[in-house]
Regions:
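Short, solvent-exposed coil/turn elements at secondary-structure transition points
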Residues: 15, 81, 107, 230, ...
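N-terminal short leaders/motifs
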Residues: 28-56, 157-167, 174-203
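Flexible, glycine-rich phosphate/dinucleotide-binding loops
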Residues: 48, 84, 108, 233, ...
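Conserved beta-sheet core of the metallophosphoesterase superfamily
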Residues: 62, 66, 91-123, 185-249
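Active-site-proximal loop/helix segment associated with metal-binding centers of metalloenzymes
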Residues: 104-191
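Binuclear metal-dependent phosphoesterase catalytic core
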Residues: 214, 218-294, 298-303
């Protein structure tokens, strides 16, 4: 596809609609919906996982669909571990494979190593993989996605009516959970790179979510964007694909509504993987001036 004809596309993740501390309500996304022709929600869009939040999550998801439909905005939903049945789609490729998207839950057998249910999820993941994978070959992308879904279901069954303790409280009560999260955050970019090398070797850009820690990294010529989450622990990001470029913006909350910050914190050509110059911070973005050096521009963490 001619990149100049690609619709203005915004990619978000981990809205957790319906859950306190998440984006909560679809109406809060109206400025973002109004600013694109295609909206891709890369997993954990709605808190369908927890029984106590599910009714509101389903209602807000319906409202979001209506918002997009009324504005002729194409809405694509990629399934995550909190909404494994929201869609059959687990990954997307844009611009003839130059950009690859997946939620990120399938990258680790424990799905969320910091979770009190990590052992349950790992056991379900490995059991599903053993049943579906050939002993003579490495598991396929679809087999890993199927195993991740089984792990999410296992956690769902363990939760019952839903989580009654927040992630922050869980980490305060059990400090080893916080350590597990930090270890996972540090390893996550390499997990993404390894996954892309196996399943998206032509992609020059990979967009993920899941870990809730937003960042922009370059590893071995591969651009990696984690769009973060709405709530703990930091400012979410949006990946904007327009006119053959990827632009990464902070998502700001003003007046109870979410919108993209005026200036991107990083941008690059949406090209297939190959030798590329370092991602550059936008020269006019005052908040990101430290990222103007080549080394900083290759690794931007957003607090």
């Amino acid at each position: 596809m001619d990149p100049s004809r690609h619709p203005r596309t915004i990619i978000l993740s981990d809205l957790h609609l319906g859950r306190p501390g998440g984006a909560e309500e679809a109406a809060r996304l109206l400025p973002i919906v109004d600013g694109c022709e295609r909206l891709i929600l890369n997993g954990d869009t709605a808190e369908l996982h927890h029984g106590r939040h599910r009714p509101k999550a389903e209602a807000e998801l319906g409202k979001l669909r209506d918002l997009c439909h009324a504005r002729a905005v194409r809405l694509d939903l990629i399934a995550g571990n909190h909404d494994p049945f929201v869609s059959e789609v687990r990954s997307l490729r844009l611009l003839d494979g130059a950009i690859y998207l997946t939620h990120g839950d399938a990258l680790h057998p424990a799905i969320a190593p910091w979770s009190p249910h990590a052992a349950v999820m790992r056991a379900a993941f490995e059991r599903a993989l053993a049943q579906g994978a050939s002993r003579a070959a490495a598991p396929t992308e679809d087999q890993l996605f199927a195993a991740a879904r089984e792990a999410a279901i296992a956690e769902w069954q363990s939760l019952g009516d839903g989580a009654h303790v927040s992630t922050i409280a869980n980490m305060a009560i059990r400090p080893h959970r916080a350590l597990a999260a930090v270890v996972y955050w540090r390893s996550y970019p390499a997990l993404v790179r390894d996954w892309a090398e196996r399943f998206a070797p032509t992609a020059g850009t990979v967009v993920v979510g899941h870990s809730h820690r937003p960042f922009v990294r370059t590893l071995g010529g591969l651009r990696i964007v984690n769009t973060g989450a709405y709530g703990f622990p930091g400012t979410p990001l949006a990946a904007l694909v327009e006119s053959g470029e990827v632009l990464v913006h902070r998502v700001e909350e003003r007046g109870g509504r979410y919108r993209l910050a005026e200036r991107p914190i990083a941008r690059w050509s949406a090209a297939p993987r190959g030798p590329q110059p370092p991602a550059r911070a936008d020269a006019s973005a005052d908040a990101m001036k430290p990222a103007a050096s080549a080394s900083a521009a290759r690794s931007i963490d957003v607090a």
